[in-house]
Amino acid sequence: MYKPIEIADRIYSVGCRDWDIRDFHGYSTYEGTTYNAFLILGEKNILIDTVKEKFADEFLSNISKIIDPKKIDIVISNHTEMDHSGAIPRLMQVIGEEKPLYCSKMGAKNLKSHFNRDFNFKVVGSGDEL
Protein backbone atom coordinates (compact mmCIF):
# COMPACT_ATOMS: atom_id res chain seq x y z
CA MET A 1 0.00 0.00 0.00
CA TYR A 2 1.22 3.47 -0.93
CA LYS A 3 1.35 5.92 1.97
CA PRO A 4 0.90 9.68 1.61
CA ILE A 5 4.17 11.57 1.39
CA GLU A 6 4.69 15.24 2.24
CA ILE A 7 6.79 16.38 -0.72
CA ALA A 8 6.89 20.06 0.29
CA ASP A 9 5.34 22.16 3.04
CA ARG A 10 1.59 21.34 2.98
CA ILE A 11 1.85 19.51 -0.37
CA TYR A 12 1.25 15.77 -0.33
CA SER A 13 1.45 12.92 -2.80
CA VAL A 14 -1.74 10.91 -2.17
CA GLY A 15 -1.75 8.58 -5.17
CA CYS A 16 -1.57 4.80 -5.28
CA ARG A 17 0.81 2.09 -6.42
CA ASP A 18 -0.33 -0.56 -8.90
CA TRP A 19 2.05 -3.50 -8.49
CA ASP A 20 0.27 -5.65 -11.10
CA ILE A 21 0.46 -3.54 -14.26
CA ARG A 22 3.17 -4.73 -16.66
CA ASP A 23 2.59 -2.44 -19.63
CA PHE A 24 1.79 1.26 -19.45
CA HIS A 25 1.33 3.08 -22.76
CA GLY A 26 3.80 0.71 -24.41
CA TYR A 27 6.41 0.90 -21.65
CA SER A 28 7.38 -2.21 -19.69
CA THR A 29 6.54 -1.78 -16.02
CA TYR A 30 7.91 -4.92 -14.38
CA GLU A 31 7.70 -3.32 -10.95
CA GLY A 32 4.28 -1.74 -11.48
CA THR A 33 3.55 1.96 -11.61
CA THR A 34 2.19 4.78 -9.50
CA TYR A 35 -0.91 6.83 -10.14
CA ASN A 36 0.01 10.32 -9.05
CA ALA A 37 -2.38 12.66 -7.27
CA PHE A 38 -1.50 15.65 -5.11
CA LEU A 39 -3.19 17.41 -2.20
CA ILE A 40 -2.30 21.05 -1.51
CA LEU A 41 -3.42 22.50 1.82
CA GLY A 42 -3.96 26.22 2.19
CA GLU A 43 -6.71 28.86 2.18
CA LYS A 44 -8.40 26.40 -0.16
CA ASN A 45 -7.60 22.70 -0.07
CA ILE A 46 -6.91 21.56 -3.61
CA LEU A 47 -6.69 18.05 -5.04
CA ILE A 48 -4.90 17.56 -8.35
CA ASP A 49 -5.97 14.41 -10.20
CA THR A 50 -7.23 11.09 -8.87
CA VAL A 51 -6.32 7.45 -9.57
CA LYS A 52 -7.74 4.40 -11.37
CA GLU A 53 -11.22 3.54 -10.14
CA LYS A 54 -10.20 0.22 -8.58
CA PHE A 55 -7.87 2.14 -6.24
CA ALA A 56 -10.52 4.68 -5.14
CA ASP A 57 -10.84 3.35 -1.58
CA GLU A 58 -7.08 3.32 -1.02
CA PHE A 59 -6.87 6.81 -2.54
CA LEU A 60 -9.57 8.17 -0.21
CA SER A 61 -7.83 6.48 2.71
CA ASN A 62 -4.59 8.26 1.78
CA ILE A 63 -6.37 11.61 1.74
CA SER A 64 -8.07 10.79 5.06
CA LYS A 65 -4.68 10.31 6.69
CA ILE A 66 -4.07 14.03 6.08
CA ILE A 67 -7.50 15.71 6.13
CA ASP A 68 -11.17 14.82 6.06
CA PRO A 69 -11.84 14.48 2.30
CA LYS A 70 -14.95 16.67 2.73
CA LYS A 71 -12.56 19.56 3.43
CA ILE A 72 -11.30 19.46 -0.17
CA ASP A 73 -12.53 22.70 -1.75
CA ILE A 74 -11.37 22.31 -5.35
CA VAL A 75 -10.53 19.40 -7.65
CA ILE A 76 -8.32 19.86 -10.71
CA SER A 77 -8.34 17.30 -13.51
CA ASN A 78 -5.23 17.63 -15.68
CA HIS A 79 -6.44 15.09 -18.22
CA THR A 80 -9.07 12.43 -18.53
CA GLU A 81 -7.21 9.14 -18.91
CA MET A 82 -8.61 6.73 -16.35
CA ASP A 83 -5.34 6.48 -14.42
CA HIS A 84 -5.81 10.18 -13.58
CA SER A 85 -9.59 10.49 -13.45
CA GLY A 86 -11.07 7.05 -12.73
CA ALA A 87 -11.83 7.83 -9.07
CA ILE A 88 -13.54 11.18 -9.78
CA PRO A 89 -17.12 9.88 -9.37
CA ARG A 90 -16.34 8.25 -6.01
CA LEU A 91 -14.35 11.27 -4.84
CA MET A 92 -17.12 13.71 -5.76
CA GLN A 93 -19.70 11.50 -4.06
CA VAL A 94 -17.65 11.72 -0.84
CA ILE A 95 -16.63 15.40 -0.92
CA GLY A 96 -19.85 16.77 -2.44
CA GLU A 97 -20.75 17.03 -6.11
CA GLU A 98 -21.24 20.79 -5.75
CA LYS A 99 -17.48 21.24 -5.31
CA PRO A 100 -15.84 22.79 -8.40
CA LEU A 101 -13.98 20.51 -10.78
CA TYR A 102 -11.52 22.53 -12.86
CA CYS A 103 -10.52 21.18 -16.25
CA SER A 104 -10.17 22.13 -19.90
CA LYS A 105 -13.14 22.39 -22.25
CA MET A 106 -12.23 19.02 -23.75
CA GLY A 107 -11.69 17.63 -20.26
CA ALA A 108 -15.26 18.53 -19.27
CA LYS A 109 -16.60 16.97 -22.47
CA ASN A 110 -14.60 13.76 -21.94
CA LEU A 111 -15.45 13.44 -18.24
CA LYS A 112 -19.16 13.90 -19.02
CA SER A 113 -18.86 11.20 -21.66
CA HIS A 114 -16.84 8.78 -19.49
CA PHE A 115 -19.05 9.02 -16.42
CA ASN A 116 -22.41 10.17 -17.84
CA ARG A 117 -22.44 12.83 -15.12
CA ASP A 118 -22.45 16.60 -15.19
CA PHE A 119 -20.19 17.63 -12.32
CA ASN A 120 -19.71 21.29 -11.34
CA PHE A 121 -17.20 21.85 -14.15
CA LYS A 122 -15.20 25.07 -14.19
CA VAL A 123 -13.59 25.25 -17.60
CA VAL A 124 -10.17 26.89 -17.83
CA GLY A 125 -8.13 27.74 -20.88
CA SER A 126 -4.51 28.42 -21.72
CA GLY A 127 -3.17 31.29 -19.65
CA ASP A 128 -5.97 31.19 -17.08
CA GLU A 129 -4.90 31.36 -13.44
CA LEU A 130 -6.63 29.89 -10.41
Report each predicted region and the residues it spans.
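Active-site metal-binding motif and surrounding structural segment of the metallo-beta-lactamase
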Residues: 43, 54-101
